[in-house]
Amino acid sequence: MSVAVLGAGAFGTALAISLARKAPTTLWCRSKDHADEIRSTRENTRRLPGAPLPDALAVTSDIACLGAHDVILLAVPMQKMRGFLTAHHAALSGKTLVACCKGIELDSGLGPVAVLRDTVPDATAALLTGPSFAADIALGLPTALTLACDPDETGKALQATLSTDNLRLYRTTDLTGAEIGGALKNVIAIACGAVIGARLGDSARAALMTRGYAEMQRLALARGARPETLAGLSGFGDLTLTCGSELSRNFRLGLSLGRGEAFDPSITVEGAATARATAKTAQEMGLEMPITQTVTNLLDQRLTISDAADQLLKRPLKEE
């Protein structure tokens, strides 16, 4: 299988670097100037400085390059995915498309695989998700991710193609569970960042992670997912990494909220839109997701951090 990565952000670049160490790979950039710059310097200095590109990694801004590839990794922000797929439908039709973003579409409430199937129905849709930072992957540090794909035979072939010496993939056919785990951990990371930013302590963070995980499971099971999926890399694993590191943009957004500081609006933070979309879905489905709703209220400035903590602590006592 021949692989191309669409999207020259930090994560897309890191995946392309890792794959190119194994076999020739193509990285597609939206901007010709950006592609020319990367080709010239052999480094994506704008998005992933300090990570030189292997010789086997080709860089282009020509979408026609997809004709030579069987597998396309889509490293495109969740809220821009539908527009991107619609604009390039002809080039993507009939391919194996692997979404590499984590989130819920604000307008539809759909995850990345559902959006793929909705916009390019004749493509094979898969999802690559789990605990990872771009720099770790680019540097060749040990990383394990979840590859969600149905049917499993296609998943096996993709698993073999996309695994590298340092990037180990575990597969599942539970696309719904993998989608929800990867999306909602960003919401919980915002909450955890907020309590650390407000100096409410690591005990509060642990409580939010644990009860946030319960919310992730609640929604996933209501959507027909398997509980073991959420206990794996795409759920618990990603939650653990994202809620404990300032390398996470979602956690850093939470820190800013907790400290009462402004956050750079140019930085993509998938958890903000996901919180709003999920709060709406939970209300429609009659699910209790108080942490998700609280994060939405914080983002929309309907609550202060102090009020949010007070509101969560004063909820009716219940059995765990």
Curated annotation (Swiss-Prot):
Ranges that cross the membrane: none
Compartments annotated for it: namely: Cytoplasm
Name the catalytic site residues: K185 (proton acceptor)
Catalytic activity as recorded in UniProt:
sn-glycerol 3-phosphate + NAD(+) = dihydroxyacetone phosphate + NADH + H(+); sn-glycerol 3-phosphate + NADP(+) = dihydroxyacetone phosphate + NADPH + H(+)
Keyword Lipid metabolism appears in the UniProt entry: yes
Pathway(s) it belongs to: Membrane lipid metabolism; glycerophospholipid metabolism
Location (main, coarse): cytoplasm
Q: Which UniProt keywords are given for this protein, alphabetically ordered?
A: Cytoplasm, Lipid biosynthesis, Lipid metabolism, NAD, NADP, Nucleotide-binding, Oxidoreductase, Phospholipid biosynthesis, Phospholipid metabolism
Q: Which residues form a coiled coil?
A: none
Q: What are the EC numbers?
A: 1.1.1.94
Positions binding NADPH in this chain are F11, R30, K102, A134, R249, E270
Name the residues that bind sn-glycerol 3-phosphate.
K102, G130, S132, K185, D238, S248, R249, N250
Q: What Gene Ontology biological process does one annotation of this record name?
A: glycerol-3-phosphate biosynthetic process
Q: Name one GO molecular function term.
A: glycerol-3-phosphate dehydrogenase [NAD(P)+] activity
GO cellular component entries: cytosol
Q: Which PANTHER family match?
A: GLYCEROL-3-PHOSPHATE DEHYDROGENASE, GLYCEROL-3-PHOSPHATE DEHYDROGENASE [NAD(+)] 2, CHLOROPLASTIC
State what this protein does: Catalyzes the reduction of the glycolytic intermediate dihydroxyacetone phosphate (DHAP) to sn-glycerol 3-phosphate (G3P), the key precursor for phospholipid synthesis.
Family, as annotated? Belongs to the NAD-dependent glycerol-3-phosphate dehydrogenase family.
Q: What is this protein called?
A: Glycerol-3-phosphate dehydrogenase [NAD(P)+]
